[in-house]
Amino acid sequence: MDKERILTPAVVFSVALLHLAMVALLWQAHKLPVIESGNVIEFVDLGDFGGGDGAPEGAGAPAAPEPQPEPEPPKPVEPPKPVLKPVLRKRRMRIFSSLRKSRNLKKSRNPKKNRNQSLSRKRSLSRNRRKNRSRKPSEKPAEHPSNASAKADSEQGNGEETGTKRDGTGRGEAAVNVSVGVKGEHGEGAGSSKGNPLRANGSIPRPAYPTLSMENDEQGTVVLSVLVSPGGHVESVKIVKSSGFSRLDNAARKAAQNGHFQANAWTEFKVPVKFELN
């Protein structure tokens, strides 16, 4: 019973709220529209009533005058070119043509001499070709005689030797002459005597003639000092006398470093290398 008493007022209250909401909705639907009042502005064209200066209606401002084109500046007058060079050229051409004609006449007058000269040139070229073919491509090193006599003092260790020279040819028309001589011991220890002569020999490969030296006609003789240890190993190469051209000196030095020597003691070889063009 208590529960029913509590529910009845709540139901009544909710039903009342629903009726109020329905009434409010119906009231808003039947409302009349409210007309809003505002200021109205009208625009009037004053040009239809004529201008203030007495001109007819629609007459505007006067048109601006058209700009006149500027006159073109006068072209500079070119001075006349002098006519002197063609005359000089004609004279020169005439002189050269006359000289050529005179030379051709001289050559035609002596046909036998011209033929002889051409034949001699052909013969010289054929001889040079035969010489180049006869030369072997592999260059042999210059040999030194095995018996090189040495005379030295027992206290100082200085000696004098003699070596033979052999001519050789290089590449093409170049010739390189190499000869090897023995100077004696380096100065360490006792020197040799007549009863115990120093025996040493050696050879170096023929150095290649530098191409730039051949083109510039560089010739000369290089004297090298080659120090050889016991066993034939080249220890150092020095230039005693230069040829005057660094390329020739370097070529001779490289060839001496690759030389083959036979020595029982420290031996200094003097190697002259001659570069010449045939």
Swiss-Prot record:
Query: GO MF terms on file?
Result: energy transducer activity
For bias kind Pro residues, which ranges apply?
A: 64-83
Q: Which GO terms describe its biological process?
A: protein transport; transmembrane transport
Bias type Basic residues, positions: 87-135
Which residues are exposed on the Cytoplasmic face of the membrane? Answer: 1-5
Gene Ontology CC, one term: plasma membrane protein complex
For this UniProt record, the keywords arranged alphabetically read as follows: Cell inner membrane, Cell membrane, Membrane, Protein transport, Signal-anchor, Transmembrane, Transmembrane helix, Transport, Virulence
Which PROSITE patterns has this protein been placed in?
TONB_CTD (PS52015)
Q: Where is the TonB C-terminal domain?
A: 194-278
- Superkingdom is Bacteria
Localized where?
Cell inner membrane
Which parts of the sequence are annotated with region: Disordered? 51-203
Residues assigned to the Periplasmic compartment are 28-278
Alphabetized InterPro entries for the sequence: TonB-dependent_transducer, TonB/TolA_C, TonB_C
Q: Which residues cross the membrane?
A: 6-27
According to its record, how does it sit in the membrane? Answer: Single-pass membrane protein
Q: How does it assemble?
A: The accessory proteins ExbB and ExbD seem to form a complex with TonB.
Name the protein family. Answer: Belongs to the TonB family.
Its biological purpose is as follows: Interacts with outer membrane receptor proteins that carry out high-affinity binding and energy dependent uptake into the periplasmic space of specific substrates. It could act to transduce energy from the cytoplasmic membrane to specific energy-requiring processes in the outer membrane, resulting in the release into the periplasm of ligands bound by these outer membrane proteins. Required for heme utilization and virulence.
Task: Check the record and name the PANTHER family matching this protein.
Answer: PROTEIN TONB, PROTEIN TONB-RELATED
Question: What's the name of the protein?
Answer: Protein TonB
Species the sequence originates in = Neisseria meningitidis serogroup C
